[in-house]
């Protein structure tokens, strides 16, 4: 079964989110999963015991957690543990009012360059605002507004960058996957049309030279 036309040239939102949720993020566990060594004399069943055992494909950090000692896990697992009350999520260093203000200032002062944000910044911000709002030190409503301001500033520059689009080249460095995904159908469509126009012009020129 063929994909719908709108999904043939882009990722769906769910696909983008799936990719992002496999990225690592720092958490503060509220549980201990690290094996506890007990002395032989202390209990009849000597050896190691585990308070919690979580099953996942990459279980080293997950099954060696110590309560209130930071560690890194995949974002999807961090969100699951957060939902179950087993951890708090440490917000990324770039997701603060001060840092977002710095990014916004850069975007406004540099008309032809984009701030060097993480490739997944929009999705990360959306997921953490939605599912871990109480883990931020800064007010979430202000952070949301800053993210929106940053997004709008970058969208304006993307629109200007598309004015320089040709049939073979478009360079817009430091765009996130979501931003590229949004502009890709339009950009690819325009480049295909320009390529057809150039090919037709070349054919006409060759025909004229052969007359």
UniProtKB/Swiss-Prot annotation:
Its main location: nucleus. It is found in: Nucleus. CDD domains: GINS_A_psf2, GINS_B_Psf2. GO terms for cellular component: chromatin; CMG complex; GINS complex; nuclear replication fork. Belongs to the GINS2/PSF2 family. Component of the GINS complex which is a heterotetramer of SLD5, PSF1, PSF2 and PSF3. This is DNA replication complex GINS protein PSF2. It comes from Eremothecium gossypii (strain ATCC 10895 / CBS 109.51 / FGSC 9923 / NRRL Y-1056). The gene is PSF2.
